[in-house]
Amino acid sequence: MRVAVGMSGGVDSSVAALLLKEKGYDVIGVTLKLSSIVCSNDIQVCCSPQDIKDAKRVASYLGIEHYVIDWEDIFREKVINYFVEEYKKGKTPNPCSVCNREVKTGRLAKFVNIVLGADKFATGHYIKIEDHPVYGKVIKRGSDIKKDQSYFMALLERDVLDLLIFPLSDLTKEEVRKIAEDYKIPVSQKKESFEICFTAGKTPAEYLLENNLLAFESGDIVHIDGKTVGKHKGLPFYTVGQRRGLGVRWREPLYVIEKDAERNTVVVGEREKLLTDHVSSEDFNFLVPVEKWKKEGLSVQGRYRQKAVKIKDVSIEGNRLTAYFEKPEERFAKGQVLAVYDGDILLGGGIIV
């Protein structure tokens, strides 16, 4: 079987390629060129020129073919432009989930299958993919819960699942690092990438500001009861649930409740005002057909590494899904992905509204 591995030049994807080769697969490496940014050594992003060099070194070390695909224009159109437009609307987008659908996983899996003749596409994500007796092919949380990345796959098209392999599904990060060291893989000591890959270590607001991608306008910070309590320095600097850095004096701590792009205001309130009994999402993507969903025991996640929140019911109108919490929970940020789970099984996801 011919398996293409998405190689980022990091430890995880390098070990994924190694493990597949050790199992006897016909392995090829594929690396995307998504950015021309050259970062300093203390900033780890992905898909940069240095990462391509690292991926080439690893592929050569493993003795596998390696291809570089220049999708910088596609990445700009599908991910960066989306990121900017969502911030213009006052939202807090999750570009990594969109990227996995539009570029790094969904699109690339189809590309290597059609163009390079690969039967399967593998990545170094900490995710499981299994056959379920009721749901069919499903994505599940990885064994290393601290590193689980299933949340970022919530927007994937269902027909891609049959192409995917995740060799690190049952491993921990520590075990993967140990394998890399034992096999003397050239990037075994490389640091992890934690940032949004195209911001080069900057916060989203800093990236938007420094690249003149968005006009930052100061506006009012308004208490949920209607009183103006301060000034904000631009909506991208704030997100729902934020408490620190508001610059507002009040009799008790205030939190960001909402960002109103039309009025250019940040709405704040006490913690109890942050609580809600539901969350809604649009353009919901069903990885498991909704008619197969269980009626109870489901949970939702509204950002990466957030603890799953139990829900008691869901309602669906067209492409809009609303989940109702078992008890009041803090609001989720608009623009993030709402992922729905049955235990460890990812049922689908949509964009929070």
Curated annotation (Swiss-Prot):
Residues 147-149, 303-304 are annotated as: Interaction with tRNA. It holds the Pfam family tRNA_Me_trans_M. The record marks H125, Q336 as: Interaction with tRNA. ATP binds at G6, M7, S8, G9, G10, V11, D12, S13, L32, G124. SUPFAM superfamilies: Adenine nucleotide alpha hydrolases-like. InterPro entries: MnmA-like, MnmA-like_C, MnmA-like_central, MnmA-like_central_sf, Rossmann-like_a/b/a_fold. It comes from the Bacteria. The active site is at C99 (nucleophile), C197 (cysteine persulfide intermediate). One of its GO terms (cellular component) is cytoplasm. It is found in: Cytoplasm. Belongs to the MnmA/TRMU family. This is tRNA-specific 2-thiouridylase MnmA. It comes from Persephonella marina (strain DSM 14350 / EX-H1).
